[in-house]
C-alpha cells in the first residue's frame, strides 16, 4: 500500500506539471518472503490440547474441536460444517465430504472420549435450537466462523507457550507429517519382523 501511495502522489505531481518525471517510476512492491507453516512436535500438540482441558461447556467443545483438527487433518471449513451424524463415537471415526468425495478418518480412544463428553455434557448447554444438526457452534448457539476458530487456535497456541505460530494450516501440516512418520515406522517394523521370521 505504501508503494502504491507513493506512486500515486508522484503521478499527481507529474500530471500537475510540478515534476518532469515521476521519481517513483519503476517502484515495485517488495516481495514478501513466504514462510512455511510451523510443524508442531508431538509433545507440542499434547501441550496445545492440554490447554483446552476443563469441565465447562466451552472447554469441552474446544477440546473436541481442536482434537479433531489435530487427529484428522480436517480443514477448518470442513470442521465447522460437520453435523452430528458425521461422527460415530461408538466406533471412533469422522466422515466428511471434500470435493464431492467422502472421506472417513478414524481417531483414537482419547479423542473418542473427548467427543462423548462434549456431546453428553457440553453441547446440550450450548444448544439453543433443539433441531440444530451441526456438531459445533459458537457460545451464542450460532454458526462458527473460520476466523473465530483461527483466533481460538492462535490463543491456545500462545497459552501453551509454543514458539512457532500455531494456525489451522500448521495443524493440518503437522497431522500429515506425523502420519507419514508413523506409517514409515510401521513399514520398517514389518520389514524387521519379516526378516526375523525368515531366519
Where on the chain are the PLM-derived regions?
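Conserved catalytic core of the tyrosine transesterase superfamily
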Residues: 1-199
Amino acid at each position: 500500500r505504501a508503494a502504491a501511495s507513493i506512486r500515486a502522489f508522484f503521478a499527481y505531481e507529474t500530471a500537475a506539471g510540478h515534476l518532469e518525471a515521476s521519481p517513483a517510476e519503476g517502484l515495485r512492491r517488495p516481495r514478501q518472503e513466504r514462510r512455511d507453516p510451523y510443524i508442531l512436535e508431538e509433545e507440542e500438540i499434547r501441550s496445545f490440547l492440554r490447554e483446552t482441558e476443563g469441565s465447562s461447556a466451552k472447554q469441552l467443545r474446544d477440546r473436541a474441536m481442536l482434537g479433531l483438527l489435530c487427529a484428522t487433518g480436517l480443514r477448518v471449513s470442513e470442521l465447522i460444517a460437520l453435523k452430528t451424524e458425521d461422527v460415530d463415537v461408538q466406533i471412533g471415526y469422522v466422515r466428511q465430504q471434500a470435493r464431492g468425495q467422502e472421506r472417513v478418518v478414524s481417531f483414537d480412544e482419547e479423542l473418542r472420549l473427548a467427543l462423548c463428553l462434549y456431546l453428553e455434557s457440553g453441547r446440550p448447554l450450548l444448544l439453543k435450537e433443539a433441531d440444530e444438526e451441526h456438531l459445533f457452534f459458537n457460545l451464542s448457539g450460532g454458526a462458527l466462523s473460520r476466523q473465530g476458530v483461527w483466533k481460538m487456535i492462535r490463543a491456545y497456541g500462545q497459552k501453551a507457550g509454543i514458539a512457532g505460530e500455531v494456525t489451522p494450516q500448521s495443524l493440518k501440516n503437522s497431522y500429515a507429517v506425523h502420519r507419514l512418520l508413523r506409517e514409515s515406522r510401521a513399514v520398517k517394523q514389518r520389514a524387521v519382523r519379516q526378516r526375523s521370521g525368515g531366519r
